[in-house]
From Swiss-Prot:
Belongs to the MurCDEF family. Signal peptide: none annotated. SUPFAM superfamilies: MurCD N-terminal domain (SSF51984), MurD-like peptide ligases, catalytic domain (SSF53623), MurD-like peptide ligases, peptide-binding domain (SSF53244). One of its GO terms (molecular function) is ATP binding. Cell wall formation. It catalyses: UDP-N-acetyl-alpha-D-muramate + L-alanine + ATP = UDP-N-acetyl-alpha-D-muramoyl-L-alanine + ADP + phosphate + H(+). It is found in: Cytoplasm. InterPro entries: Mur-like_cat_sf (IPR036565), Mur_ligase_C (IPR004101), Mur_ligase_C_dom_sf (IPR036615), Mur_ligase_cen (IPR013221), Mur_ligase_N (IPR000713), MurCDEF_pg_biosynth (IPR050061), UDP-N-AcMur_Ala_ligase_MurC (IPR005758). GO terms for cellular component: cytoplasm. Keywords: ATP-binding, Cell cycle, Cell division, Cell shape, Cell wall biogenesis/degradation, Cytoplasm, Ligase, Nucleotide-binding, Peptidoglycan synthesis. NCBIfam families: murC. It comes from Xanthomonas campestris pv. campestris (strain ATCC 33913 / DSM 3586 / NCPPB 528 / LMG 568 / P 25). This is UDP-N-acetylmuramate--L-alanine ligase.
Length: 477
């Protein structure tokens, strides 16, 4: 039956049923929540039962555990993430029924079509930068819509439909899907060699993709570029669009001066165009987070948010899930009290930045790291860089690689990485087969007063939460 738009009154009522395959993923769940708020009938399936699926179910989504062809029957549109295989039964059924299929990024682009879009791209720092930008615009009274790849702790969610005209979202370069977006503002935080398996193992193709991303801006659009990053700086010099730069470099349009770390906070002077300066206390540690804050400040300044309002938003920022989350102190069975920090970092450059933030904020503590490598391909491609940065900590425990659907690659597992670190002669890493074993092994490594960083993009975050909630194995209740 052909549906007539005139009879429905609007597009939501004409095509109301949207199904998400892999609804529990960070990018998918945020879009699903916004569409729920817009009035769509949202359903979805996922192999995992997590906080995102439970939240969506509470909001009214119909969430199914596991994938089945029957799940898409009666649906008007199916949204899929790039993690979904071509032989997924729901995807195959949607094709056979000629149900429209939308990649996740394409659906985000559809949402952006009805707002003024701000897309935040870059190999590292997207989630934090997008979250800070949402906080600055909210503090400035602009009530933005946001879609973030992590939980904004102040909102208790990774997405929100705002009443204002601006939508700020992460633009995912990992699979090239950010090239589906057509924002009015585009941020690039940095460009690094990651996800090369999706670019034919050719970094030049990664560089070209970021250049094309900026080409998708309209002629009246704006590129906000971090010129402290050499790759982004090179791009800034040749992009045929309006550019505003940010960074700690003297020639940045928006820059941070007199940067110092004070425990878990950063203090600096924010210098805006036309010479305006404002003191800022950022509620996040690390110089890398100062750069993220500068991008948010540049967005706020462009949209008329007052400098003191920008500073207030940065100072009151409550953080993002799994981005240097201080989970508190835990006591081992031997009585050692340690502070536990959970972080999503999984690339050598991210590890280096987090280690620097930890040492800058807690210089007198031993730095103990429990790390779960993410993907065999990344471990292989960044093997030497991983070995170098992980050799700098005081004690290291490695769990096996989180495969993320990949088959094992010889010489790219945690035991090979431990051998390479051991050969450097600076530390003696401990290897556990399963990430759940960290709770049992860590007490033998930890000393009183240590700072324990639990890092990785897999399921190590659940172990960190479990340790804080239930204690280490063998510890008194």
């Amino acid at each position: 039956m052909i549906r007539r738009l005139q009879d429905s009154g609007d597009l939501v009522r004409a095509f109301p049923r949207v199904h998400f395959v892999g609804i529990g993923g960070t990018g998918m769940s945020g879009i699903a929540e916004v569409m729920l708020t817009l009035g769509y009938e949202v359903s979805g399936s996922d192999n995992a039962d997590n906080a995102a699926t439970r939240r969506l179910a509470k909001l009214g989504a119909r969430v199914m555990r596991g994938h089945s062809a029957a799940n898409v029957l009666g649906t008007d549109c199916v949204v899929v993430s790039s993690a979904i295989r071509e032989d997924n039964p729901e995807l195959m059924e949607a094709r056979s029924q000629r149900i429209p299929i939308m990649p996740r990024a394409a659906m985000l682009a559809e949402l952006m079509r009805f707002r003024r879009g701000i897309a935040v791209a870059g190999t590292h720092g997207k989630t934090t930068t997008t979250s800070l930008a949402a906080a600055v615009l909210s503090e400035g009274g602009l009530d933005p819509t946001f879609v973030i790849g992590g939980q904004l702790l102040a909102a208790g969610a990774n997405a929100k439909l705002g009443g204002g005209q601006w939508l700020v979202a992460e633009a995912d370069e990992s699979d090239g899907s950010f090239l589906r977006l057509n924002p009015l503002m585009a941020v690039i935080t940095n460009i690094d060699a990651d996800h090369l398996e999706n670019y034919g193992n050719d970094f030049a193709r990664v560089q070209a993709a970021f250049a094309e991303f900026l080409q998708r801006l309209p002629f009246y659009g704006l590129a906000l570029l971090c010129i402290d990053d050499p790759e982004v700086a090179a791009l800034a010099g040749k992009t045929p669009r309006h550019v505003m730069s940010y960074g700690m470099s003297e020639n940045a349009d928006v820059r941070a001066e007199d940067v110092v770390q004070d425990g878990p906070r950063m203090r600096f002077t924010l210098r805006l165009p036309e010479g305006t300066t404002t003191p800022v206390t950022l509620a996040l540690p690390g110089r890398h987070n100062v750069l993220n804050a500068l991008a948010a400040a540049a967005i706020g300044w462009q949209l008329g948010v007052a400098p003191d309002t920008i500073a207030r938003a940065l100072e009151n920022f409550a953080g993002i899930g799994r981005r240097f989350n201080d989970l508190g102190e835990v006591t081992t069975a031997s009585g050692a009290r340690v502070r536990v920090v959970d972080d999503y970092g999984h690339h050598p450059r991210e590890l280096e930045a987090v280690f620097a933030a930890a040492r800058g904020g807690w210089p007198d503590k031993r730095l103990v790291v429990a790390f779960q490598p993410h993907r065999y391909s990344r471990t292989r491609d960044q093997f030497d860089a991983f070995a170098a940065v992980l050799s700098t900590v005081d004690a290291l425990v490695l769990s096996e690689v989180y495969p993320a659907g990949e088959a094992p690659i010889p010489g790219a597992d945690s035991r090979a990485l431990a051998r390479a670190i051991r050969a450097r002669g600076r530390s003696e890493p401990v290897v556990v087969g399963q990430v759940a074993g960290l709770s049992e092994v860590l007490p033998d490594v930890l000393q009183d007063g240590d700072l324990l960083l639990m890092m990785g993009a897999g399921d190590i975050g659940y172990v960190a939460q479990q340790i804080v909630t239930d204690g280490f194995v063998g510890a008194p209740a």
